[in-house]
Amino acid sequence: MATAAEQWVLVEMVQALYEAPAYHLILEGILILWIIRLLFSKTYKLQERSDLTVKEKEELIEEWQPEPLVPPISKDHPALNYNIVSGPPSHNIVVNGKKCVNFASFNFLGLLDNPRVKAAALASLKKYGVGTCGPRGFYGTFDVHLDLEDRLAKFMKTEEAIIYSYGFATIASAIPAYSKRGDIVFVDRAACFAIQKGLQASRSDIKLFKHNDMTDLERLLKEQEMEDQKNPRKARVTRRFIVAEGLYMNTGTICPLPELVKLKYKYKARIFLEESLSFGVLGEHGRGVTEHFGISIDDIDLISANMENSLASIGGFCCGRSFVIDHQRLSGQGYCFSASLPPLLAAAAMEALNIMEENPGIFSVLKEKCKRIHKALQGISGLKVVGESLSPAFHLQLKDSTGSREKDVKLLQEIVNHCMDRSIALTQARYLEKEEKCLPPPSIRVVVTVEQTDEELERAAHTIKEVAQAVLL
């Protein structure tokens, strides 16, 4: 029975072969021959080449110039001329054995050496040990992490918060968690380096607008709107983001948030706000630029900030709606693939948050001190103040550049060194010059804290004026 069936199938195959069109048979024949060729042919060809003579080898060796193992570095490079700090960089700092008033460290609320913060960290150290030895998604989640996230969400009046173990990685992870290839991000040209790295990792289409220029931003949004009208199918799947800083690290200026929110709703974009400098600084209760302008937190899609400037700790956090934050727990690279924040640092941040809530007057004190030194530094010979009067971190730039960045840096460093000799600790703003998208001009960064007395602020301003006049004139 089986033999008869097999014969019938064979007859059908032969009949189908006769009935098939000629081009079909030719195509199948070519494919069969090509498969046979691929199976039996070599995957490479041996190319004939002649060996070099001894003389030719010697000539090549003579001509070869090896690259230096280490690139040439100037003797003035900061890496070769470093300062040694002894003790915590709090109100007073010991640099190279000399005690100075600290105008260089980001310790806005003066909590870095606070006894309560240190006691909370020590108690956590005794309870949990030093590290967690794992990322949050595995065995690196401790109850203190969940408590801190809950406290931050309540403080910022958002649905949920997420903490990262490294401040720089917070916004650098949050941006690529949402913005992907094909999406469009409108970003200020003065954006900090962490934002730049996040944009680079996202592989999105980046459109830069002039610093705090809402007219230029609207121009770019209109151009994109016109492009979307040409291809509505693509526009439906293209997301648009606006990325800004509350207080800009590179300029000390505040973002025009009310105008940004208007443009967001007009052109259907999402706002990501980086508040590392404005959190714990702006607003009646230190909630940042949204509280400063009276903008509803719901108008901002994502807020990011580090805990290294005001909370006297390490790491960072993002806050917003629950569905926005939950997405980061699966897509935030710095959250998924990094060991979680050491519990002692989470406990320190929580205690700092307690102090902020118990003493809201600290923010008005900081604001007054910022205004005081900002006013005192006006009219310096050869230098100009760059930044808002309410910013605790602002810049002193040369009014007239020498035309050489290297020479400008040397002049400013000379001012810093002379101020250090007179017990005022300052620092230049440093950048990875080859990596920066829009490299800011050289500057001296001045940082104000609540611990600095009025007398120290006046003395610092007077010292900077005298030194600048001696160096630049």
Specify the residue positions occupied by each region the protein language model found.
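Active-site phosphate-binding strand-loop segment of PLP-dependent enzymes
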Residues: 107, 207, 211-273
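PLP-dependent enzyme catalytic core of the Aspartate aminotransferase-like
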Residues: 2-7, 13-24, 28, 33, ...
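Conserved N-terminal alpha-helix of the aminotransferase class I/II PLP-enzyme fold
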Residues: 36, 119-167
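Conserved PLP-anchoring active-site segment centered on the Schiff-base-forming lysine
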Residues: 174-193
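Active-site C-terminal subdomain of aminotransferase-like
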Residues: 267-270, 277, 282-390, 396-402
